[in-house]
Amino acid sequence: MSNCELTVLKPAEVKLSPRDREGIINPMYDCQPAGAQYAGIGIKDCIPLVHGGQGCTMFVRLLFAQHFKENFDVASTSLHEESAVFGGAKRVEEGVLVLARRYPNLRVIPIITTCSTEVIGDDIEGSIRVCNRALEAEFPDRKIYLAPVHTPSFKGSHVTGYAECVKSVFKTITDAHGKGQPSGKLNVFPGWVNPGDVVLLKRYFKEMDVEANIYMDTEDFDSPMLPNKSIETHGRTTVEDIADSANALATLSLARYEGNTTGELLQKTFAVPNALVNTPYGIKNTDDMLRKIAEVTGKEIPESLVRERGIALDALADLAHMFFANKKVAIFGHPDLVLGLAQFCMEVELEPVLLLIGDDQGNKYKKDPRIEELKNTAHFDIEIVHNADLWELEKRINAGLQLDLIMGHSKGRYVAIEANIPMVRVGFPTFDRAGLYRKPSIGYQGAMELGEMIANAMFAHMEYTRNKEWILNTW
């Protein structure tokens, strides 16, 4: 008989739980009005009007300027004590008329509530009816769409605020235009992604010979001042694009929490089929997206994308087993990003042991198939904390959690610096590394970019800490 023993590996555990305290320490997500403003600035000839204090606009615009290195026009009703007591309806009505007079090309105004205006109970829909009558009287030859966006800051996050604004603007405009002739186009809701991701998606659709409208089209967030470019608004999604969404062949929702509700609205109201697929982080998710596009449109996946896939696979294979295998990773940010990056990490042999999701939609996460997929494929334990903050990350590191890499936005950089752990910047906002908003994180090209960013962060850390840096001489 042999003396060898049989080791039985315990099954991996994926634990999903909320933050274990009421107070927030070092928040990792923004409020609902911030997300609503981001959706608004993606629309051409649109200026969001935030019904609240000036800080609800000023600090969000600062975040946009830090991330994109561009200025964005967002208006505020500048709520003060008097309005908090007697109501702020007059501030809304005055703000809408001032915007209409100041911006002759203005066509859309999302009216975004805040915690203060939701608490005092301002009737936004009633104010919009009053504003519409005033606009018709003063500007009979112009049509300005006013969309009510209810985004109290005391619940949800920038993710739910983004989704709410997109849905409200689409409902307002499509209800006004109704159903028209079929366009044969594809509606695409990529969610909260960077301009570089939008450019990549456009290229994919062009190579597949598919006509698509991407909502919201942020490509011009990074573009020169050209003669036909608006100096007030940077978004490329037009009112006509939004109205035409009711006539589309189908909707492709690439973000479960950041646009899928609008796809469901179009399906329910105008019978436009809605196909929900995972945000295309990594190879498999990109494969699934392209297959779905081919299935819906009848187009073939071109050789150019097959070649790009092969290049990405080759680049990632050069890194995965030698440098990434068994490396522990913590990821924080909004849910579609975090779960998508976790799937990508699994593809390249990284181990996403801690996922921090800055949102309070706990019941929805329990039904997310990506979490079930992680349970079925991981050979290591994973902890997922929703409604999280950055203290949840710092606390676990201080308690002894061994990490080789942190992935998240720039607000978490001091945690990585203090713990001497390499960090890759992804998500929003990223302002301490140059030009990240221009680079894609999705698709085959994005997978290759992410893999190389991770590798280079690890390589730099090996050199600065003199930890087996000699390996880089022989690689």
Swiss-Prot record:
For this UniProt record, the keywords arranged alphabetically read as follows:
ATP-binding, Iron, Iron-sulfur, Metal-binding, Nitrogen fixation, Nucleotide-binding, Oxidoreductase
So what does this thing catalyse? N2 + 8 reduced [2Fe-2S]-[ferredoxin] + 16 ATP + 16 H2O = H2 + 8 oxidized [2Fe-2S]-[ferredoxin] + 2 NH4(+) + 16 ADP + 16 phosphate + 6 H(+)
Q: Which SUPFAM superfamilies match?
A: Helical backbone' metal receptor
Q: What is its EC number?
A: 1.18.6.1
Subunit notes for this chain? Hexamer of two alpha, two beta, and two delta chains.
**InterPro entries xrefs:** ChlB/BchB/BchZ, Nase/OxRdtase_comp1, Nase_comp1_CS, Nase_VnfK
Task of the protein: This vanadium-iron protein is part of the nitrogenase complex that catalyzes the key enzymatic reactions in nitrogen fixation.
Protein's UniProt keywords contain Cytoplasm = no
Name the PROSITE patterns on file.
Answer: NITROGENASE_1_1, NITROGENASE_1_2
Q: Which cofactor does it need?
A: [8Fe-7S] cluster
Which of this chain's residues are annotated to bind [8Fe-7S] cluster? 31, 56, 115, 153
The molecular function GO annotations come to: ATP binding; iron-sulfur cluster binding; metal ion binding; nitrogenase activity
Among PANTHER family, the record links this protein to: LIGHT-INDEPENDENT PROTOCHLOROPHYLLIDE REDUCTASE SUBUNIT B
**Organism (species):** Azotobacter vinelandii
Kindly provide the name given to this protein in its UniProt entry.
Answer: Nitrogenase vanadium-iron protein beta chain
Similarity-based family: Belongs to the NifD/NifK/NifE/NifN family.
> GO biological process: what's one of them?
nitrogen fixation
* Classification via CDD domains: Nitrogenase_VFe_beta_like
Question: What note does UniProt attach to the cofactor annotation?
Answer: Binds 1 [8Fe-7S] cluster per heterodimer.
